[in-house]
Amino acid sequence: MYTAEQKARIKWACRRGMLELDVVIMPFFEECFDSLTESEQDDFVALLESDDPDLFAWVMGHGRCENLGLAAMVDKIVAHNLSKVR
């Protein structure tokens, strides 16, 4: 599990260089991070180390991450955001 200080750092890392990513990633972190398994939390943190153009392409469905754990996390993020608009 992550400490409050670590979560604060993760939240800061959710702030991206692209507003489009901020709008997708930050709500997922705030609403879902604590309910993820430890392995999923690790995948989320690892995903934040990705370059913005790659992350944007994956979230928009214009490509697929080769790492299966990260790809599954992208799918969770996308599904969470789609559930909010339906």
Curated annotation (Swiss-Prot):
GO terms for biological process: succinate metabolic process. SUPFAM superfamilies: YgfY-like. Keywords: Chaperone, Cytoplasm. It is found in: Cytoplasm. InterPro entries: SDH, SDH_sf, SdhE_FAD_assembly_factor. GO terms for cellular component: cytoplasm. Signal peptide: none annotated. It comes from the Bacteria. Coiled coil: none annotated. The keyword Transcription regulation does not apply. The keyword Chaperone applies. Its main location: cytoplasm. Belongs to the SdhE FAD assembly factor family. An FAD assembly protein, which accelerates covalent attachment of the cofactor into other proteins. Plays an essential role in the assembly of succinate dehydrogenase (SDH, respiratory complex II), an enzyme complex that is a component of both the tricarboxylic acid cycle and the electron transport chain, and which couples the oxidation of succinate to fumarate with the reduction of ubiquinone (coenzyme Q) to ubiquinol. Required for flavinylation (covalent attachment of FAD) of the flavoprotein subunit SdhA of SDH and other flavinylated proteins as well. This is FAD assembly factor SdhE. It comes from Vibrio cholerae serotype O1 (strain ATCC 39315 / El Tor Inaba N16961). The gene is sdhE.
